[in-house]
Swiss-Prot record:
Protein name: Small ribosomal subunit protein bS6
Listed Basic and acidic residues bias regions: 104-113
Lineage: Bacteria, Pseudomonadati, Pseudomonadota, Gammaproteobacteria, Pasteurellales
Keyword RNA-binding attributed: yes
The entry's keywords: Ribonucleoprotein, Ribosomal protein, RNA-binding, rRNA-binding
């Protein structure tokens, strides 16, 4: 089995469907004997350019090890799902398990936000 990195963007009005979509896609990979090495839900983000007059989309990143049949099935599913605006599937040489730069940047900002909130609470007292 080969390793793949999959990113897909979902219509912002369909964001509530994302957990179900992730569950379906990961389920099909696992049923075929594949593995999910990394799964990140980046949430709703600004697009670099408008797609179908939309300026935001819900991003999901998956790193999987799966047979080619499952990848073909995912491609077909993405193509015929109107909620998926764009997708990319890239074959990688190795399994990628460390956090992506998007998640690392978010984690670096969180402690600062917590400190700021504590300072704000102290100022109120």
């Amino acid at each position: 089995m080969r390793h793949y990195e999959i990113v897909f963007m979902v219509h912002p009005d369909q964001s509530e469907q994302v957990p179900g979509m992730i569950e379906r896609y990961t389920g099909s990979v696992k049923e075929a004997g594949g593995q999910i090495h990394r799964l990140e839900d980046w949430g709703r983000r600004q697009l670099a350019y408008p797609i179908n007059k939309l300026h935001k989309a819900h991003y999901v990143l998956m790193n999987v090890e799966a047979p080619q049949e499952v990848i073909d099935e995912l491609e077909t599913t993405f193509r015929y799902n109107d909620a998926v605006l764009r997708n990319v599937i890239i074959r990688t040489k190795h399994a990628v398990t460390e956090a992506s730069p998007m998640v690392k940047a978010r984690e670096e900002r969180k402690p600062l936000t917590e400190v700021e909130n504590n300072d704000f609470e102290d100022a109120e007292e």
